[in-house]
Swiss-Prot record:
Single biological process term from Gene Ontology: regulation of DNA-templated transcription
Bias (Basic residues) ranges: 163-174, 1150-1163, 1558-1572
Subcellular location(s) per record: Nucleus speckle
Highest taxon listed in the record's lineage: Eukaryota
Biased composition (Polar residues): 1093-1104, 1192-1202
Positions of modified residues (Phosphothreonine): T1315
Annotated Gene Ontology cellular component terms: cytoplasm; extracellular exosome; fibrillar center; nuclear body; nuclear speck; nucleus
Biased segments, Basic and acidic residues type: 175-197, 944-961, 1322-1342, 1416-1426, 1480-1499
Its job: Transcription factor that binds specifically to the RAS-responsive elements (RRE) of gene promoters. Represses the angiotensinogen gene. Negatively regulates the transcriptional activity of AR. Potentiates the transcriptional activity of NEUROD1. Promotes brown adipocyte differentiation. May be involved in Ras/Raf-mediated cell differentiation by enhancing calcitonin expression.
Protein name, as recorded: Ras-responsive element-binding protein 1
Location, primary (coarse class): nucleus
Gene name of the record: RREB1
């Protein structure tokens, strides 16, 4: 627009100033002096974009083609260019969101896309009124508000517009100066200003001038490029050192504050040709140009706000100072000022209407006012000496009339009274401020804001605005709060005037003459303070002197107010009182009687403090705001009015904001939180704050049902996650769920912030949660040090805060779908075994039903109400108005075999209905249809956190209890409830009975069943109350329990109904979703019911912790658990999670790990010949997830289905929960369905093109798609599909033979029984694992083969597959070993193809070929890594190595020996392999994590058929990585570099995180010692679980991941170990120990950390000599786990 020729500008000017003014007025905004809309090109086009950016855009649009700066591609439109250059960014495939053109790094892809508009010049959003274009819709809409105001009511709307304008200016950054100019957003401010609109001649060429050196440029780009040379020259005022964003702001500041005009090199005024000066007078639109006063107004305004003439016809420029005026009269008036200055007289400037002036004078005299022009201005630029205050006060004392009662009331000395008056604004108006209400104070005219706040609007520095000011004054007086009445004016006219001004706080009559004694400090140069004094201010000359003299004028005022309101004394008296007792009364702020009083005080204060300061600042030139806000131009004159806080150095643009701010200082805000000491500035802020206490999240996304406390967050969520672009779509998808005020009140008053253990009132629920960790961390059993309660399911990294863990997952585990992140945060740090019960007893005793625990309020007491519902213990009566479902403690089955009914919790929270104990009772539980209960997505699918925590505590305690714990976890019901409370992944509670060793395998299974039925992971209030929950930090920290927030996925929102069958699915789904991190699945997998007794413990733990996943996995806990329990005490372990929890139990974190580990542990436990990893859907899924191999995943899912059927048919072998789930429905279906369950309610469903998975967010699908990127070729995919199916059968078969045998071998006769009972489910799972793993391995081999073939092509994929395959192979081997150990193990594997190297047989040739390739790679990798790894395991480790090079060598060594050795060796390997394999698996998982790191778990079936987007390729093995960091870590697997060394055991690690995690093993070991052998075993299991978790989590990507990868590999190995180890545990214990010891002197512990695998157990048994010394905990935990497995 600037480009428009001067002619156009002229034309617009020709239209005459009137036209211009009218056009300007249509803008409806008054820009303060600074707002200089660019010259209006033409009235018709008033709002041309005045930004250089816009001009650029327009110039660009004029071009016929646009060239890409990167590839020179020619685009015909800017939009094409935008879309094209955006592609350059996506090509990098990185996650750093950096611009490929300028390298700028942005926070998100959307920000980067928006940023690209800068380079393309496209401004897609255009104002329909004025045509201005914007890069963002928000900016355009903000701009549109300019036009929303009535064009004719520009004056009226002026005040609001400044705000917007200002915001615009500050927010929108246009090209350098243009930005500030834009701040005068008057649409009329065309780009003319940018062009030399002043130089009409030059304008013809549209020349751009550098505002610093005035160099000319023909295009904006040239100017912008040139401006970069001045980037280091800050725009700073040489006089007052204030900095400005734009040159224009600096010019305006100098002209207004320092009266310095820009000058050219010759020293002559340089305004009209200065491109930095805004062109045009449209900013004068704030007043009617037809008004008689317009000449004077425009003269005064133009003297302060420099403008350039746009029209040659209408050029009214002063020859002396080069200032331009819109009309001749204005110029004439202005010239008089020069004449007067020359004469040295400051004669009043001739007013167009002298008569009016006289009238005004008389009127003002009556008011005790006088024109500033009549008062000889005292230089105000020199700051007043501090004693000025005293002087001023003294003068006031002398000159200001005192109200008779004023001083007398408090017997204040006149001086005091004066000071009081000064300090009080609206109160007895400051005598000072009243001393002169010269109009000038209105130099910034007072504008009465709608809120009755007074805004000082600097109008002109040199002339006063008489009428407007008076009107404002009157208005202000009228608006003054009635309470603040002024004493009669001493010199005021009689009653009438007094009556008028009675309420006008500040206007107290003063002598007409300015006090001679007053020294102006920062008054505007032209005025003396007296003149400046504005209505409510003390003389500006006293900065915040009142503060110094008195407690603070504001405070005094507030006190006075308080006194006033309280004592009813005259405001003045009150004021004095307050002043006298300075801060004494401030504390009584709350005592302020009414908000009115507060408001009036604040108003008084605001005007007073803010005005005093404003004037000082404005006059002084500390108008930072003015200068700062070039937007001021856009804003009406009042725009420049800044409101500085009297108590601090903050400056506000609006009096309302200042008022609210002052309240915060005075503490008189009526909006105070009744729970904590928070004082809100306004009601909305208080409401938002209260939600932090109530946990209310009223705004719910209708698509995914995620709740938000603030609507803006929900809107952003819809835009980013659901791609809702339009306001209509967004509004349509936001649901507001209001909760009754009573609920909120109750919530706020509820004792949800009081610690039930120590009675401390934490004020905030969040603080309580954090505080509870101190109790949870104290292990009552003395076992746990205060551990960080939140653990990453993927890498077992521990965090003190959940948000930190979530952040970690977002950053490190990119494969984890956002919707599943909650499930990856494990509340690992439950109370110690003893601790949990104790804590629960104290916290949840009532609910738990444990008499001992009964003393304490249920945990629910700690829980904040969700959506206004309080979580209360059953014993606590809900507030009368809050309808809460009370769940009697009895409602929770004391029988630990009975699962807790979490659905009730959900009900309680949701007010579904009050249900009686029957719900909780097992019988009622079964009848209870979980399917009717919504799945609470807000509760992590793995209730593992809580479950594991619960399990852990109970387990820790239950080592003794475990015998009886199965059915009755412990004598104390509380622990039991905690166990039952533990939910399976499916949300089913895992009953503590699981912990019982072999003693009660079946009963635990039943509880599992019960919990499984409770597929809905909802903690009932009772559950919440249950001591275990309380005790477990997991619960406390558990989002579900602790979060008072509106149910994240609102509990109210029904999730897909979960029937008994569904629960398994739900469980599976949850498991899968949680398994999205393979670790979860692994853990969720049934732990091989290794040793019955040990297994029982482990299983119990697992059952608790792992059970959760298992439960989730196991739709029918009964079926799953029963077989497990009956066959093996580890039946609970059959839930991988449950098993894992056992391991976790000791550490508490093991729960999480246990989960993942649980999967592996279960496989170990199921050493009965079934490779848990390869057996059962869960194992398969776990592996799939761990390996993140889409192919494998799909097969596993299918296998799960097949296994479900097959398992049902051949259930005997697999007695794990998976079988139940499988029985319930095909594991795959269940997994998928479970996964789907999470989003069933989502309105938006995006289906994965490669698999059945559905995602609510595009980002989730995107992430998930990565799981398909590593998948094998289509053939492989087909093979994978076949594998999946075959895997199922294999799993079934394998588990039957291998699993059973393994179990037998492992001493899991009970497990066999359990397997037989749960054969279908568990057998399926074990088969699924064993077979699945073998088939998987076969498939993996085939896939591997395919991948191997394609591996070269897709090294990353292949390696992932290979790793997966290797893992599967290891599992296979383990399974085979198990099979060998248990005759059925190998036989059950219907492997028609046998591996020449390891003798393993595979169903699919592809699997076999991949398996062989794995061997082939293994050797090299082993050589690379440790050279010790056998070919078979080596390959797995190798991938892991690649992913986690540091640990790879050891892992490779471990796994290699297992893999490479002969079948006998193989068994040893398998046994050891689990450890090594685990490391390999971990590595593999890690690699996969790297490879598939994002959604790898997301797509169960989809085979990766997409091109690998990982751009970083390993030059050695061609493996691909997402980031250079991952590649660097991976290279360590080739270089053998292990830069991190454990100081305790000298073990070295590739990744720092691995070292950190490893060191935790030592810490845990110490804890484990406290907990006892079982605890140690559990702990080690936990570690393994952690490792698995870590690796399974596909954490290879991060160092943590990498480090975890070895651990994960170990876990994987362990899983395999579990599989193999179950069979080989006894056989290969020695081998494994030897190998692990040899291969991983220090890793053994980790490798063995997966004690869940029988092999691991065996190994641990054997290893104790070498490894246990190094890792006592590992040894202990592993030993325990192994013992369990061995049993």
């Amino acid at each position: 627009m600037t480009s428009s020729s001067p002619a156009g500008l002229e034309g617009s000017d020709l239209s005459s100033i009137n036209t211009m003014m009218s056009a300007v007025m249509s803008v409806g905004k008054v820009t303060e002096n600074g707002g200089s809309p660019q010259g209006i090109k033409s009235p018709s086009k008033p709002p041309g974009p005045n930004r250089i950016g816009r001009r650029n855009q327009e110039t660009k649009e004029e071009k016929s083609s646009y060239n890409c700066p990167l590839c020179e591609k020619i685009c015909t439109t800017q939009h094409q260019l935008t879309m094209h250059i955006r592609q350059h960014n996506t090509d990098t495939g990185g996650a750093d969101h950096s611009c490929s053109i300028c390298g700028k790094s942005l926070s998100s892809a959307s920000s980067l896309d928006r940023h690209m508009l800068v380079h393309s010049g496209e401004r897609p959003y255009k104002c329909t009124v004025c045509g201005q274009s914007f890069t963002t819709n928000g900016n355009m809409h903000r701009h549109m508000k300019i036009h929303e105001k009535d064009p004719n009511s520009a004056t009226a709307t002026a005040p609001p517009s400044p705000l917007k304008r200002r915001r615009l200016s500050s927010k929108r950054k246009l090209s350098h100066d243009a930005e500030s100019e834009r701040e005068d957003p008057a649409p009329a401010k065309k780009m003319v200003e940018d062009g030399q609109s002043g130089d009409l001649e030059k304008k013809a060429d549209e020349v751009f001038h550098c505002p610093v050196c005035f160099k000319e440029f023909v295009c904006k780009y040239g100017l912008e490029t040139h401006m970069e040379t001045h980037s280091d020259n800050p725009l700073r005022c040489d006089i007052c050192c204030v900095t400005f964003r734009t040159h224009r702001g600096l010019l305006r500041h100098n002209a207004l504050v320092h009266k310095q005009l820009p000058r050219d090199a010759m020293g002559r005024p340089f305004i009209q040709n200065n491109p930095s000066i805004p062109a045009g007078f449209h900013d004068l639109g704030f007043t009617d140009f037809s008004c008689r006063k317009f000449p004077r107004i425009s003269q005064a305004w133009c003297e302060t706000n420099l403008r350039r003439c746009i029209s040659e016809q209408h050029r009214f420029v002063c020859d002396t100072c080069d200032k331009a005026f819109p009309m001749l009269c204005s110029l004439a008036l202005h010239k008089q000022t020069h004449v007067a200055a020359d004469q040295g007289q400051e004669k009043p400037q001739a007013t167009p209407l002298p008569g009016d002036a006289l009238d005004q004078k008389g009127f003002l005299a009556l008011l005790g006012l006088q024109h500033t022009k009549d008062v000889r201005p005292a230089p105000a630029e020199e700051p007043l000496p501090d004693d000025n205050q005293a002087i001023q006060l003294q003068t006031l004392k002398c000159q200001l009339p005192q109200d008779p009662g004023c001083t007398n009331l408090l017997s204040l000395s006149p001086f005091e009274a004066a000071s009081l008056g000064g300090s009080l604004t609206v109160l007895p108006a400051t005598k000072d401020s009243i001393k002169h209400l010269s109009l000038q104070p209105f130099q910034k005219g007072f504008i009465i804001q709608p809120d009755s706040s007074i805004v000082v609007k600097p109008i002109s520095g040199e002339s006063a605005i008489e009428l407007a000011d008076i009107q404002q004054i009157l208005k202000m007086a009228a608006s003054a709060p009635p309470q603040i009445s002024l004493p009669p004016f001493s010199k005021a006219p009689a009653a009438p005037l007094q009556a008028i001004f009675k309420h006008m706080p500040p206007l107290k009559p003063k002598p007409l003459v300015t006090p001679r004694t007053v020294v102006a400090t920062s008054t505007p140069p032209p005025l003396i303070n007296a003149q400046q004094a504005s209505p409510g201010c003390i003389s500006p000359s006293l900065p915040p002197p009142p503060l110094k003299l008195l407690k603070g004028s504001v405070e005094a005022a507030s006190n006075a107010h308080l006194l006033q309101s309280k004592s009813g004394t005259q405001p003045h008296a009150a004021t004095r009182l307050s002043l006298q007792q300075p801060r004494a009364e401030l504390p009584g702020q709350p005592e302020m009687k009414t908000q009115l009083e507060q408001d009036s005080i604040i108003e008084a204060l605001l005007p007073l403090s803010m005005e005093a300061k404003i004037k000082q600042e404005i006059t002084e030139g500390e108008l930072k705001a003015f200068m700062t806000a070039p937007g001021g131009k856009k804003t009406p004159a009042m725009r420049k009015v800044l409101y500085p806080c009297r108590f601090c150095n903050q400056v506000f643009a609006f009096s309302g904001v200042l008022r609210a701010h002052v309240r915060s200082h005075l503490g008189i805000s009526p909006y105070q939180c009744n729970i904590c000491d928070y004082i809100a500035a306004d009601k909305a802020a208080l409401i938002r704050h209260l939600r932090t206490h109530s946990g209310e999240r009223p705004y719910i996304c209708k698509i995914c049902h995620y709740p938000f406390t603030v609507k803006a967050n929900c809107e952003r969520h819809l835009r980013k996650k659901h791609l809702k672009a339009t306001r209509k779509d967004i509004e349509k998808n936001i649901e507001y769920v209001s909760s009754s005020a009573a609920e909120l009140v109750d919530a706020f008053c509820a004792p949800d912030t009081v610690c039930r253990l120590c009675g401390e009132d934490l004020k905030h629920y969040r603080a309580l949660r954090i505080h509870m960790r101190t109790h949870c961390g104290r292990g009552l059993g003395g076992g746990h040090k205060g551990r960080k309660p939140f653990e990453c399911k993927e890498c077992s990294a521990a965090f003190a805060a959940k948000r930190n863990c979530i952040h970690h997952i977002l950053k490190q585990h990119l494969h984890v779908p956002e919707q599943d992140i909650e499930s990856y945060v494990l509340a690992a740090d439950g109370l110690g075994p003893a601790e949990a019960p104790a804590a629960e007893a104290s916290g949840r005793g009532e609910d738990s039903g444990c008499a001992a625990l009964g003393d304490c309020k249920p945990l629910t007491a700690f829980l904040e109400p969700q959506n206004g519902f309080l979580h209360r213990g059953p014993t606590q009566p809900p507030p009368p108005h809050v309808s809460i479902k009370l769940e009697p403690a009895s409602s929770f089955a004391v029988d630990f075999n009975e699962p807790l009914d979490f659905s009730q919790k959900g009900l309680a929270l949701v007010q579904v209905k009050q249900e009686n104990i029957s719900f909780l009772s097992p019988s009622s539980l079964v009848p209870y249809d979980c399917s009717m209960e919504p799945i609470d997505l807000s509760i992590p699918k793995n209730f593992r956190k809580g479950d594991k925590d619960l399990a852990t505590p109970s387990e820790a305690k239950k080592p003794e209890e475990e015998a009886g714990s199965s059915e009755q976890p412990s004598p104390c019901p509380a622990p039991g409830p905690s166990l039952p409370v533990t939910l399976g992944p499916s949300g089913i509670l895992e009953s503590p009975m699981a912990p019982a060793p072999a003693a009660t395998p079946e009963p635990p299974a039943q509880p599992l069943q019960g919990p499984v039925q409770l597929a809905v992971p909802i903690y009932s209030s009772a559950l919440v109350s249950s001591p275990p929950l309380v005790g477990s930090s997991a619960l406390l920290s558990g989002t579900a329990l602790l979060r008072p927030l509106r149910p994240k996925p609102p509990l109210l929102l029904p999730k897909p109904p979960v029937t008994e069958e569904l629960p398994p699915l739900a469980s599976i789904a949850q498991i899968i979703s949680s398994v999205s991190s393979a670790p979860t699945l692994l853990k969720t997998k049934v732990a091989d019911p290794g040793p019955a007794s040990t297994g029982s413990n482990t299983t119990a733990s697992d059952s608790l912790g792992g059970s959760v996943p298992k439960a989730a996995t196991t739709a029918t806990p009964a079926a799953t658990t029963s077989p497990k329990e009956s066959s093996e005490p580890p039946a609970p372990a059959s839930s991988p999670e449950a098993a894992s929890p056992t391991e976790q139990g000791p550490a508490g974190t093991s729960k999480k790990r246990g989960r993942k580990r649980g999967m592996r542990s279960r496989p170990r436990a199921n050493s009965g010949g079934v490779d848990l990893d390869s057996s059962g859907e869960f194992a398969s899924i776990e592996k799939m997830l761990a390996t993140t191999d889409t192919n494998k995943f799909s097969p596993f899912l299918q296998t799960a289905e097949d296994n479900t059927q097959d398992e049902v048919a051949g259930a005997p072998a697999d007695h794990h929960g998976p079988s139940d789930e499988e029985q319930g429905s095909p594991p795959e279906d269940k997994l998928l369905r479970a996964k789907r369950n999470s989003y069933t309610n989502c309105l938006q469903k995006i289906t994965c093109p490669h698999c059945p998975r559905v995602f609510p967010w595009a980002s989730s699908l995107q992430r998930h798609m990565l799981t398909h990127t590593d998948s094998q070729s289509d053939a492989e995919t087909a093979a994978a599909a076949g594998e999946v199916l075959d895997l199922t059968s294999r799993d079934r078969e394998q588990p039957s033979e291998g699993a059973t045998e393994l179990r037998q071998v492992a001493g899991d006769a009970p497990v066999e029984q359990a397997t037989a009972e749960t054969a279908s489910p568990v057998h399926r799972e074990e088969h699924g694992r064993g077979e699945s793993h073998e088939p998987e391995e076969e498939h993996g081999t085939e896939e591997s083969t395919g991948d191997a073939d394609g591996a070269e092509e897709d090294a990353s994929s292949n390696q992932s597959l290979d790793l997966d395959f290797a893992t599967k192979l290891m599992d296979f081997k383990l399974a085979e070993g198990d099979g060998e150990a248990g005759a059925g193990g190998a036989a059950s594997q219907e492997q028609k193809l046998a591996c020449d190297t390891c003798g393993k047989s595979f169903k699919f040739l592809g699997t076999l070929s991949r398996h062989r390739k794995a061997h082939g790679r293994q050797e090299p990798k082993d050589e690379k890594g440790d050279g010790a790894s056998t070919a078979e395991e080596g390959p797995q480790p190798a991938p892991e190595q690649e992913e986690k090079p540091p640990e790879t060598p050891a892992e490779v060594v471990e796994s290699a020996p297992g893999a490479g050795e002969a079948p006998a060796e193989k068994l040893a390997e398998e046994t050891e392999g689990p450890s090594d394999g685990e490391s390999a698996a971990e590595k593999r998982s890690s690699e996969k994590s790297d490879d598939d790191k994002k959604p790898k778990t997301d797509s169960p079936k989809s085979v990766a058929s997409k091109a690998d987007k990982r751009k970083k390729v390993c030059s050695v093995c061609n493996k691909r990585f997402w980031s250079l960091q991952d590649l660097t870590r991976h290279m360590r697997s080739h270089t053998g570099e292990r830069p991190y060394k454990c100081q305790t055991c000298e073990r070295t690690f590739t990744l720092k995180h691995s070292l950190v995690r490893h060191q935790r093993i030592h810490q845990k070991a110490r804890h484990a010692k406290h907990h006892g052998k079982d605890s140690d075993k559990e702990e080690r299991g936990e570690e393994d679980s952690e490792n698995e978790s870590t690796h399974s989590g596909n954490n290879a990507v991060s160092e943590n991941e990498a480090e975890l990868a070895p651990n994960a590999s170990n876990h994987m190995a362990v899983t395999r170990s579990r599989k193999e180890g179950l069979a080989s545990a006894t056989k290969d214990c020695s081998h494994r120990e030897e190998k692990v010891t040899a291969g991983w002197p220090s890793e053994p512990g980790q490798g063995d950390l997966n004690p869940e695998s029988p092999a691991a157990l065996g190994q641990d048994l054997l290893e104790p000599r070498s490894k246990r010394p190094a890792h006592p905990i590992l040894a202990t935990a592993d030993g325990a786990s192994q013992l369990v497995g061995m049993e």
